[in-house]
Design a protein with these regions (language model features):
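Intrinsically disordered, metal-sensing/regulatory segments
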Residues: 1-230
Length: 230
């Protein structure tokens, strides 16, 4: 269980590191957009080749159902964020944070299940998650800091996200250890659906708004490098 918790927190720890980096290092707005585009490409590759590959045991209808559940979870969280913070500025940035949770928690549950069932954990997938989290955290943190969030508040936000992912990995391990039929298929499909919704509604518009046309090129580069690493 501790191994699962450690892997879950390690894979998502770049959220905390990148989220705090923008508080001490001035990152140009355009560069943040390009990095966000790069992260979007890496995440598209993760959905296409890792998450959907993990969910291959599901039938087509069940796969679609769990992906739609992931979409519903993201949209529900995004709705709460808009009501609390508004749709622009901090609200738009918090939408990406919600997407990080919707994406990271199911991913971490999958890690826990894989460890408990002695299923080989894909190092390339863990690396893709770690790397793609960097612009995914850097982009909204820059906006949140600009809207008045303190370093402590930002650090607490991302630390809670990372710890939630670690706990999710431990719970995935315990669930798999208690049930011989447990697998990560449904969690992978849920994460894929929520992630695609977040990319479309939050991260990719965010990338284009700040990075302009180069965000599209960065997306392709991020996708290609992730594919080459699988």
């Amino acid at each position: 269980m501790l191994e699962a918790f450690g892997l879950g927190t390690l894979a998502q720890s770049s959220l905390l590191l990148a989220g705090l980096l923008v508080c001490w290092v001035t990152v140009p707005r355009r560069l943040i957009g390009i990095l966000a585009g790069f992260g979007a490409g890496a995440l598209i590759a993760a959905v296409s080749f890792d998450l959907l590959g993990e969910a291959e045991g599901l039938g087509s209808w069940e796969l679609a159902l769990w992906m739609l559940i992931g979409v519903a979870v993201f949209l529900g969280g995004d709705f709460v964020v808009e009501r609390r913070f508004g749709s622009e500025g901090a609200g738009g940035a918090m939408g990406i944070v919600v997407g990080s949770v919707v994406d990271g928690v199911p991913e971490s549950i999958i890690f826990g299940i894989q460890i408990a069932t002695d299923f080989p954990v894909s190092i390339s997938f863990v690396a893709a998650v770690f790397v793609s989290n960097i612009p995914q955290a850097m982009a909204p943190s820059a906006d949140l800091a600009a809207s008045g969030w303190s370093v402590r508040r930002l650090g607490t936000l991302w630390l809670l996200v990372v710890l939630a992912c670690g706990v999710a990995a431990a719970l995935g391990y315990l669930a798999a250890d208690a049930s011989s039929s447990a697998n990560g298929d449904r969690m992978a499909a849920l994460a894929a659906g929520g992630l695609l919704a977040m990319l479309t509604n939050s991260l990719m518009p965010f990338a284009y708004d700040r990075g302009g046309a180069l965000a599209g090129a960065a997306t392709v580069v991020g996708f290609c490098l992730s594919v080459l690493g699988t």
